Amino acid sequence: VKRAVTDGVLIVTGGPGTGKTTILKFVIEIMEHLGLQIELAAPTGRASKRISDTTGREARTLHRLLEYNFNNNSFNRNADYPVEADVIIIDEMSMVDVMLFHSLLKAVAKGTRLVMVGDVDQLPSVGPGNVLRDLVNSDVIPVIRLNEIFRQAGRSRIVTNAHLINRGEMPVLDNIDEENDFL
């Protein structure tokens, strides 16, 4: 939480149930308490609604944040007209492609903090690039990796097996319910 408040750029990554959203809520509360103007966004409408519902704060799609202009197929927010915020927080960063990330970076004003949150082990964006994975592997941007499962649903076989597979371990295949489990 401290790094998200103090670092200029930060990535928070972890699998399902590791506490990304919980940390995000604390970070937002602290930043608001400090009087910082925060913009919260995600790549899709569904993702922005989910983060808005879980944090209780307004979140927008990246296209809305950057003010997409349908007439000229570009964004109104850019280096000449950046997003007005002290902090920009992007959730579900694994879904952001190279072109959208480039547009976002152009619209980040000097001195604005950028916090990117997502699961590096999710499928990459539909568009070109695997931005989150490339940023995490770059060793240029500070990365906080969350590994421990806290969510109660984390005890489900699907979540448990996803974490085992990500660590290169064999999934748990005992007690398979042929009607409800898929192999």
Which residues does each PLM region occupy?
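Pre-Walker A (Motif I) flank of P-loop NTPase domains
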Residues: 5-12
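Walker A (P-loop) phosphate-binding loop of P-loop NTPases
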Residues: 17
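Conserved lysine of the Walker
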Residues: 20
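Short glycine-/polar-rich loops that comprise or flank the Walker A/P-loop
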Residues: 35-36, 85, 110-113, 139-144, ...
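Conserved P-loop NTPase motor core of helicases/translocases
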Residues: 37-42, 46-107, 148-149, 158-159, ...
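Conserved helicase motor core of P-loop NTPases
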Residues: 120-183
